[in-house]
């Protein structure tokens, strides 16, 4: 189900935002197409939207809808065929002792403290590192779908928190933050491998990773997980030769 007119909720409406500065490509303007009303977007409907290239931030369900750019490609890992690189095997073996526990979405001050440390070191100056519990709650905790908060602990110490959505055909990776001060750690890589393992446990074929942008260093890690499919012209196809895909502006 990758076409909007295939969605079961015919009462959904879509609007396009005004232009705003792109978070990933310098000197570019972005726009989003937003699905509304949010209370109609349950797990089944959201699963169809994800197949059509949408994702969510809190209760806000959107996809890129820019005027002169198609660089954002929705991507998903085909988990049963996932072939690990040597560095990914090292990450799995190094961190597999982490204890993962799944919860319904909830606020905890330990999670928030870890989130602030992560933002301060990984995304300093981006606005997300400001001390605002309300912003944190609004960004991560609202959901109308089957969402889980996953804690990863090492000898009782909180190392990572990941928000995931369980969909009819896969898991959607919503957001992850982790301890930025552990030397040599590769928590982010391990998290994706854990989510892929969880897909296999649930007999779900895909792990949705959001958007991949060829010219964004923030997004480069996603291309390391193969086989990777991208939604191109309404069809999911294998992402192979990366140089063949668009950078940004169309003529």
Curated annotation (Swiss-Prot):
Name one molecular function that GO assigns to this entry.
arginyl-tRNA--protein transferase activity
Is the Acyltransferase keyword given for this protein? Answer: yes
Recorded hits in SUPFAM superfamilies, A to Z, give:
Acyl-CoA N-acyltransferases (Nat)
Which biological process terms from the Gene Ontology are attached to this UniProt entry? ubiquitin-dependent protein catabolic process via the N-end rule pathway
Q: Which GO terms describe its cellular component?
A: cytoplasm
Known EC number: 2.3.2.29
| Pfam families, alphabetized | ATE_C (PF04377), ATE_N (PF04376)
Q: Which reaction does it catalyse?
A: N-terminal L-glutamyl-[protein] + L-leucyl-tRNA(Leu) = N-terminal L-leucyl-L-glutamyl-[protein] + tRNA(Leu) + H(+); N-terminal L-aspartyl-[protein] + L-leucyl-tRNA(Leu) = N-terminal L-leucyl-L-aspartyl-[protein] + tRNA(Leu) + H(+)
Its subcellular locations are: Cytoplasm
- InterPro entries, per the entry: Acyl_CoA_acyltransferase, Asp_Glu_LeuTrfase, N-end_Aminoacyl_Trfase, N-end_Aminoacyl_Trfase_C, N-end_Aminoacyl_Trfase_N
Q: What does the record give as the function of this protein?
A: Functions in the N-end rule pathway of protein degradation where it conjugates Leu from its aminoacyl-tRNA to the N-termini of proteins containing an N-terminal aspartate or glutamate.
By what name is this protein known? Aspartate/glutamate leucyltransferase
């Amino acid at each position: 189900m990758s076409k909007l007119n295939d969605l079961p909720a015919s009462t959904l409406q879509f609007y396009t935002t005004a232009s705003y500065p792109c978070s990933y490509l310098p000197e570019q303007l972005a726009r989003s197409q937003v699905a509304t009303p949010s209370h109609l977007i349950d797990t089944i409907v959201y699963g169809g939207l994800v197949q059509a290239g949408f994702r969510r931030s809190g209760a806000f369900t959107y996809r890129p809808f820019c005027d002169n750019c198609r660089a954002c490609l929705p991507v998903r890992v085909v988990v049963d065929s996932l072939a690990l690189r040597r560095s990914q095997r090292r990450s799995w073996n190094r961190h597999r002792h982490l204890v993962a526990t799944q919860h319904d979405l909830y606020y905890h001050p330990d999670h928030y403290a870890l989130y602030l440390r992560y933002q301060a070191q990984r995304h300093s100056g981006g606005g997300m590192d400001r001390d605002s519990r309300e912003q944190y709650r609004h960004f991560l905790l609202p959901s109308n779908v089957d969402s889980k908060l996953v804690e990863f602990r090492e000898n009782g110490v909180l190392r990572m928190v990941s928000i995931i959505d369980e969909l009819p055909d896969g898991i959607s990776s919503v957001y992850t933050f982790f301890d930025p001060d552990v030397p040599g750690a590769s928590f982010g890589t391990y998290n994706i491998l854990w989510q892929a393992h969880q897909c296999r446990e649930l007999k779900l074929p895909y792990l949705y990773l959001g958007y991949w942008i060829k010219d964004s260093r923030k997004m480069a890690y996603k291309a390391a997980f193969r086989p990777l499919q991208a939604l191109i012209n309404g069809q999911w196809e294998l992402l192979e030769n990366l140089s063949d895909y668009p950078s940004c502006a169309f003529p």
